[in-house]
Amino acid sequence: MPTPHSAAPGLSERTPQSVKQQWLAILSVAVGAFALVTSEFLPVGVLNDVASDLGITAGRAGLMVTLPGIMAALAAPLLSVGIGAMDRRYLLTGLTLIMIIANTIVAFASDFNVLLIGRVLLGVSIGGFWATAIALSGRLAPKGVGVAKATSIIMMGVTLATVLGVPVGTWLSGLMGWRMTFLVTALVGVPVLLAQIFLLPPLYPDRAIRVKDLPALFTNAQARVGLIAVLLIGLAHFAAYTYVAPFFKQSAGFDGSTIGSLLLLYGMAGVLGNVFAGFAANRSVRNTLLLVALMIGTSTALFPHFATGITGAAMLIALWGFAFGAFPACASIWMFVVAPKDVERGMPLFVALFQVIIALGSFFGGQIVDQLGSSVLLSLATALVGAGFATVLVLGRNVSNNVVAQPA
């Protein structure tokens, strides 16, 4: 997700708060972001359990990832335009409440159709959150504190959820079952909701985003190169990674405890990858994105051959986790390097694209894994990553960090 330097233009000045209140408000949004993104990716780690419990295939269970992505892709631009002059404080707390309700529905769902209703609601919450989160980070920053620092705290919640949500979900599912895992995630949202109600200041806009603002990034040639690369690499990742747990169970024969440990290793490596990207991509985003694509492609290419043994699986899942941990930062910094003035206006459609990638990747990955198997899926993912690598190498050859995306 993009990370801004400053508050979105057109937002009114914040009301006076103590520095402590401001930091607590930022923390409440960060923890909310962690819970929200964890909820989105949680099914990846529990697909086997859900499929077995409800008597469905792993591919069909993958709709738990696909549907929220579709709804979030629709909600991001629609809400960003439709909320108009509404106080963003009420929007954010309302979206947190929707997340709590959605996870509770999943936890107590009597069948798969009811479960999917909860996941659709979650998608609305995800899309709405990202339609406003960037502007919120700028508004909440204490005086004298760089907006990028405040934003980085919120984005750390997102990054940790992206790379740790799956392994933590798998671990909790092994301890107490997948239903209780979703219920725990819902309960985490309750103190977050209360904190937001009492700590967030009024966030009235002076000027809302207009429909004509949305395609800002798509009209910039070098931004389009980045968007194409993000599309190809992201599709490959979400198509393949969504079904890593079934691969480990069916092809490698690992038990649930081993799978959980491997996914935790992925998450730990992802945190390191995120830190690496913060340094490397701010120096050369093109070279860093090329390296990320190379690492993901290497992982997916070697997975069918070497990930059936514990040593090979550990090495490849760690490499994959490190690479994807760096991927969101690379995507964000690319946009700031090539189109710094367009990121704010183009953010809702950027969010929509990312959610479409998640939805399409998990959907087509499910179809392929059900019909053709995991090895074919991983081979196709490798080809997509290769296409993304070539896009950056050839079409992005003129991209350089002459404009610093984010001050250190």
Locate the predicted segments by residue.
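Helix-to-loop junctions at the C-terminal end of transmembrane segments
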Residues: 75-88, 273-285, 369-370
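Paired small-residue
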Residues: 102-105, 113-122, 311-319
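C-terminal transmembrane helical hairpin of 12-TM major facilitator-type secondary transporters
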Residues: 287-331
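A late C-terminal transmembrane helix in Major Facilitator Superfamily
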Residues: 338-374, 380-381
